[in-house]
Amino acid sequence: MGQVLPVFAHCKEAPSTASSTPDSTEGGNDDSDFRELHTAREFSEDEEEETTSQDWGTPRELTFSYIAFDGVVGSGGRRDSVVRRPRPQGRSVSEPRDPPQQSGLGDSLESIPSLSQSPEPGRRGDPDPVPPAERPLEELRLRLDQLGWVVRSAGSGEDSATSSSTPLENEEPDGLEASEAGEETNLELRLAQSLHLQLEVLTPQLSPSSGTPQAHTPSPQRSQDSNSGPDDEPLLNVVEEHWRLLEQEPITAQCLDSTDQSEFMLEPLLLVADLLYWKDTRTSGAVFTGLMASLLCLLHFSIVSVAAHLALLGLCATISLRVYRKVLQAVHRGDGTNPFQAYLDMDLTLTREQTERLSQQIASHVVSTATQLRHFFLVEDLVDSLKLALLFYILTFVGAIFNGLTLVILGVVALFTVPLLYRQHQAQIDQYVGLVTNQLSHIKAKIRAKIPGTGTLAPTASVSGSKAKAE
């Protein structure tokens, strides 16, 4: 047997009477019974008798709410042609036929989504035995196509229902059902659109490890959330944010690692910068005074005697504080704790990572220094070697005038004064520095022009010098 469809809803509402449900003994003598049903299409008497004998059996079976369609008969004619009763034998051929009204009934019945045949194996009204969360992605796309077909069939059914000329007496309830079904289909259309958008969002995802897009079947929880309607946009935003964070996680870890290294390297430099810029006046003043006193002592005494005296001074200060705390404890005015306990509790050990970083830094500095010395003294570049020779020649005159400690003292004074002066007079200093660099570039160009083998470099140097002067 074919598919079973519920029709004739008006038969359930109206009571079964002799006029609506004819007796089996009366046969087809009553012309008023189902007058509209047998005038939809023209069929021959043989087709009508054959259809009636195969499908109906007796006219009393019209009172049932379900009609069984045979697969052979259903494929041969329309659905509404089966429900007609045979015409009475006494009807003349010349009698005019009523206008075809059953077509409007059939179309209105087809317009109801619960009564229309679906091209898919199951009807739309039937509950889905498998939850959408457990379906694969292809089955969800098939469901979207089915919803689109239902919307199109509902729209065609509404057009045919409005175009019918002679409605039945209980066509108004069918129209209400059709309108309700139309609202349901509109809701399902919006649901299908939102589901399509969520599938497009969730399907092309990036792999956190490789960063390439991969096809991904939505998880059950995501599929269940996608069926709740367009109000799940915050969920999509959360999912997108989650995957965005997963994509940035390796980069973030790398940045954190590099940040740790930079902090480990820049922390001493920041302390030195604070001292040189006199951010804390007391600390910078104390450091500057201590350095100048030590250097001045080294001018008159040997380095060994200066180091020994400084060490004794420090020990006298610390021992005096320690004895003072013990005396306070003896007279019951203190707890006798070490005044330097906070410094003693400081962890000065280096972790394995810090040790490796320090060793790598020291090794890199040693290797770079050795490479530079080899470059200068083994004359890898003649110009660079000549520059170094000129620098040492100038230092011979400086050494004849100044002592080494004097140069160190001048350097310390410059370190604690030049940064402040440069901050206050930055524009003027930059202007004078630019003039000096231009003069030096001209001098270098002249020297390179006179040295054999380096004449080709002179035009480029002169061009760069002219550009700098123009600026």
Swiss-Prot record:
Alphabetical list of Pfam families matching this protein: Reticulon (PF02453)
Signal is among the record's keywords: no
Biased composition (Acidic residues): 169-181
Residues passing through the membrane, by range: 295-315, 390-410
Tissues expressing this chain: Detected in skeletal and cardiac muscle (at protein level). Expressed predominantly in neural and muscular tissues.
Biased composition (Polar residues): 100-118, 159-168, 205-229
GO biological process, one term: negative regulation of amyloid-beta formation
Biological role: Inhibits amyloid precursor protein processing, probably by blocking BACE1 activity. Enhances trafficking of the glutamate transporter SLC1A1/EAAC1 from the endoplasmic reticulum to the cell surface. Plays a role in the translocation of SLC2A4/GLUT4 from intracellular membranes to the cell membrane which facilitates the uptake of glucose into the cell.
Protein name in the entry: Reticulon-2
Species in which this protein is naturally found: Mus musculus (Mouse)
Lineage summary: Eukaryota, Metazoa, Chordata, Craniata, Vertebrata
